């Protein structure tokens, strides 16, 4: 067979016939991929448009939330400076005063400027409900008074309170809770396949690269539409793949981490399990002392969010962002603190990564939010960890 092919290729007519047969096979295969790509586009196109529009709006979610909630989130400028803030433990006590008994505080978003309220995310779980309620509480940092509350997920209600929570729920779950988040994650996987099939269809089989990389001027509307789709699809393919891959990670983190763990088992994301050491006669030190302990060791950057210990062996977690000297793509440092001794247990930042899996997972949020390219074009987005606060668990 190989000898016959060699003879065919040595003959000019044989070469032409072989090339024609090969091109015919490639075109038939391309037609199949075109069908797959077209159907995937029809099925997912509308939802992808929703994800794109809501994601663009959420780039400015903080400014939007401030503007729409004066007096609740954006406060009157009565006093300047964090030195006038009430102790964080007082803030926590004020927030707890309006929460039900079974509330579980998730994250506490520290004011990003002097005129913004603390924002608490908490869940209420009942014995007979698979999906918990998710609510926000806002507290004035100067007076430790609750300025407002709102429901993100509430039993008996389809829509959340407020424009920003609505955008978040629509963006990652299509307003369908945990089930919607899984469905959107699966859509992300299928969309990745759609992008890859699009690249297969785009590939110029006859070597006409200029036609594949440019838009023909003065073309018919049909040809213009084809060229725009084909050309912009190629030039944005890497961006689309990065956004889709990171989106799958955020919606399906447990499934996403399985191959990462197989390829990089020593990643701290899988091995770190900091725990406090309870002892008789010792009580938790409180969030103020935990925060002070972290700031003594790491004074640079600004406090981003805080988390309280869960259970007797739980730890305080404190996030500091915009830390000078760290990676320009990921300038956050997360520190865990023993709730009884105040000892710093772990530090997670770009300087402490131990394996490729850590870097890969840490890159997911900068890629999705656009922070990875902010040096070239300033981009905005949620701080690390905060995006999960708008979803049920």
Language-model segment annotations:
Residues 2-393:
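Conserved histidines in hydrophobic membrane contexts and catalytic metal-binding motifs
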